[in-house]
Amino acid sequence: DDCLGMFSSCDPKNDKCCPNRVCRSRDQWCKYKLW
């Protein structure tokens, strides 16, 4: 499976973002996890 890179649109219920990235429900983008 390909993961989603920075600022890719994503589905918060089905987060396919790359490691160390998280799908933000507010923006529906993959962003860096800061914690």
From Swiss-Prot:
Q: Which taxonomic lineage is given here?
A: Eukaryota, Metazoa, Ecdysozoa, Arthropoda, Chelicerata
- State the disulfide connectivity: 3-18, 10-23, 17-30
* Pfam families named among the record's database cross-references: Toxin_12
Q: How does it assemble?
A: Monomer.
Keywords from the UniProt entry: Disulfide bond, Ion channel impairing toxin, Knottin, Neurotoxin, Potassium channel impairing toxin, Secreted, Toxin, Voltage-gated potassium channel impairing toxin
Q: Kindly state the tissue distribution recorded for this protein.
A: Expressed by the venom gland.
Named from the GO MF annotations, one term is:
toxin activity
Q: How does the entry describe the domains?
A: The presence of a 'disulfide through disulfide knot' structurally defines this protein as a knottin.
Q: What is its main location?
A: secreted
| One GO location term (cellular component) | extracellular region
- Biological role stated in the UniProt entry: Low-affinity blocker of Kv4.2/KCND2 voltage-gated potassium channels. Is presumed to shift the voltage-dependence of channel activation to more depolarized potentials and to bind to the S3-S4 linker region of the voltage sensor domain.
Q: What is this protein called?
A: Kappa-theraphotoxin-Tb1b
**Family according to the record:** Belongs to the neurotoxin 10 (Hwtx-1) family. 58 subfamily.
Claim: Nucleotide-binding is one of the keywords in the record: no
According to its UniProt record, where is this protein located? Answer: Secreted
Domain of life of the native organism: Eukaryota
